[in-house]
Amino acid sequence: DENTGQLLEQVDTLYNPAVAGGSASFPRISPDGKYLLYTEAACATFPIWHAEADLKMIRLVDKVEMDTSALNSDDTESYHSWSSDGRWVLFSSRRLDGRYTRLFIAAVDENGRFGKPFLLPQEDPEQNTLRMKSYNIPEFIRGEVKLDKGKVTSLFDIE
């Protein structure tokens, strides 16, 4: 009950670390409520620093683990978000070089199957390889972000 904070139905364990042998973090339910996408790593938080971190997904109606192999690589996959219609997943990955986190996007069909991820397009494609900074937690947005360049620049002024 969202008004009282009381649990009204039976509570089930969706992820058991003793059985799975790792930790789950950043659980996010799809907009249609069908799926739970999360990051699994060997231990604790900050999975972005764990090369074995992968994205996993559970179908909530029957608690079946879905195939997420299309999303994962031999290196880190971590922070993620759903598009508002649930047809896309945006996530961070170190699959290109194992050092820098970059954003990938993959389609999701109505049955929870993922398409092949691709590097998030940039106006200048070289930005994906020349940018020597990591992306942190990616989020989809639905509209233009209007920023005053002077105000944003002043946030990074060092006195």
Describe every region a protein language model picked out.
Residues 1-159:
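Sequence signature of WD/YWTD-type beta-propeller architectures
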